[in-house]
Amino acid sequence: DWIACDVDSNSINSDRFGFLSDGRIVAVTYEYSDNDPSKQQVLVLNRVDAAAVTTKTELTLACLYLDYNLRSQIVKFNKSNPDYRIVVKDYSEYATDDDYNAGLTKLNTEIISGNVPDILVNGTELPIGQYAAKGLLEDLWPYLDADPEYSRDKLMTQPLNAAQTDGKLYRLPIDFGVTTTVGLGKVVGEYTTWTLADVNDALSRLPEGATVFNKYYTQAEMLQYCIAMNAGSFMNWQDGTCSFDTDEFRALLEFVKPFPAEYDWQSDSDDYESDYTRLKNGKQLLYPTSLSGFSDLYYTFAALNNDIRFIGFPREDGSSGNAFNASCTLSISTTCKDK
């Protein structure tokens, strides 16, 4: 358990690791930094008596697969904080080839029995909405507002507002990106709404044979995108029900019908063209992308000669078809004694 040794396993060079004759472990680590010089170190781990280790208050952190960046931050916290220590319990270790969700089942079983972790980490695996509805999670707004260093007026509130549920912040993203679609300004720039009808109208203005996304997208993939961006139209998160017997959903099915059920790779003899090239050549209407930094923006503007519009995915209610995404979010349980 590298975290228990205050070592970030992400930095360990796998071919520079071994055991000394006296049982000690030696490893070479490399830490990359954008701002400071990168560091390479030799670590030697000695076995010590547990009684000699400084006692700290333990905070249990539950996850299904620990995020790469979060792992590094946990190690830094454990090494620097004199009073508290985060103990990671990764429930993905319970998953099997036959039951991929065994870890989630194990976690839920422990929560039901009253063994609730202090911190919950979620990528997309945990039912955070259900946990919040059952009163298991703290509203994080009061903690942010009371913090002199990280109050909400010092943070970008748009991603936090998007993560709210009925005005309460049950999960805090450790980072964020924007999932959207990009099109040429000269093609989609005039639209003030972006519904399925608008997409079909814009597509009709391109040369015959043009596609909405890359030609490799199938019906199932397109339907998944459209449902994800219109989930609120089909699902009631409060009572846990959903309804797909609507004109709106039937319109989605009609929209994805022209896409192939499966792409025929064997019959495709065309040379590969990037999404940006297809956009500029009028062969493709939109390119779905995720923007996680200014470098992504810069590359997109440069690739399309600054003639771009981040118009997003079609939504029938006329609202923005863009969405925030995060590598993971953090939640605090209401049973945590050390908030």
Predicted region positions:
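Short helices/loops that flank or line small-molecule/ion binding pockets
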Residues: 98-116, 120, 129, 201-205, ...
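Short helix-loop capping/hinge motifs at secondary-structure junctions, enriched
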Residues: 170, 186-194, 335-339
